[in-house]
């Protein structure tokens, strides 16, 4: 998971792109907002991974083997499995952070071309487990990349409410102007994660990948966040890489990964019946 530790999310791609040797460069939120108006449109039907296989550089072993997934727009999808099973690598394929060894990403029945990658990434948000925050105030971290005079403060508050951190921030003497310290040192792990989630909501991207992004939240806060996500309109598509069963119970489809392959998929109740390994995960209530 080294690449995950280095990756700070779609708004913070510079380090990750240099590691995985993509030619595209990071753009600020302001540039992305302008760019989105003219080019690749938000998908209306499906995001499809077709026969995706992937081998990391200098490795003889395939990290992914013939992955086929169709994600209907507006659904909540979960990837589960042990560390190294392929779930994060699959999410990286959806985000075009890794070039597949074979196979293709299809958006609304149209294969995504190399020239479309930046456009596609501008439509997505990635919320990692390990959050990188600016040594600045809360409003700058939520509206990442925007000049202060371009920030919509009302929209920042709306995003903070959706991320279940409104009460805390509103109780602070300086509220949105509170400095979070170096990499968010003045915040708890759960608070940092919620700031990152608020950032994704502020960008108003409709495809959001959450890579163990609720791991530091207590059960009640996580439950409230999942409820808030469920109440969003059907234009939002969520992909959860989860560490707790409670995160994925309400998902429309759960994909179980094992050794770079999908070993089972279906709704929660369906997997309870047909997957022994999923039942074992449920009994432990944690995904190792």
Summary of predicted features, one role per range:
Residues 101-111, 253, 262:
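ABC nucleotide-binding domain "signature motif"
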Residues 20-75, 111-113, 151, 158, ...:
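Primarily ABC-family ATPase nucleotide-binding module
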Residues 95-96:
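Helix-to-loop junction immediately C-terminal to a conserved catalytic motif
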């Amino acid at each position: 998971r080294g690449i995950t530790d280095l990756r700070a999310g779609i708004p913070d791609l510079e380090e990750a792109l240099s590691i995985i040797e993509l030619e595209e460069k990071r753009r600020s939120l302001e540039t992305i907002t302008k760019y989105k108006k003219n080019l690749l449109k938000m998908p209306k039907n499906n995001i499809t991974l077709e026969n995706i296989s992937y081998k990391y550089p200098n490795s003889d072993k395939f990290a992914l083997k013939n992955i086929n997934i169709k994600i209907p727009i507006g659904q909540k999808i979960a990837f589960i499995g042990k560390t190294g099973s392929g779930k994060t690598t699959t999410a990286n394929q959806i985000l075009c952070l890794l070039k597949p060894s074979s196979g293709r990403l299809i958006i609304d029945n149209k294969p995504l071309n190399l020239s479309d990658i930046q456009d596609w990434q501008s439509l997505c948000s990635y919320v990692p487990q390990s959050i990188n925050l600016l040594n600045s105030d809360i409003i700058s971290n939520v509206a990442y990349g925007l000049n202060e005079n371009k920030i919509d403060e009302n929209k920042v508050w709306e995003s903070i409410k959706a991320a279940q951190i409104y009460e805390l921030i509103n109780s602070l003497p300086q509220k949105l102007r509170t400095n979070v310290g170096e990499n968010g040192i003045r915040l708890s792990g759960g608070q940092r994660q919620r700031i990152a989630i608020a950032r994704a909501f502020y960008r108003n991207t409709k495809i959001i990948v959450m890579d163990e992004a609720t791991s530091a939240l207590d059960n009640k806060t996580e439950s409230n966040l999942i409820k808030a996500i469920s109440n969003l309109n059907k234009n939002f598509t969520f992909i959860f890489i989860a560490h707790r069963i409670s995160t994925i119970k309400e998902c429309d489809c759960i994909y179980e990964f094992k050794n770079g392959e999908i070993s089972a998929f279906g709704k929660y109740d369906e997997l309870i019946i047909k997957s022994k390994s999923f039942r074992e995960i449920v009994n432990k209530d944690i995904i190792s």
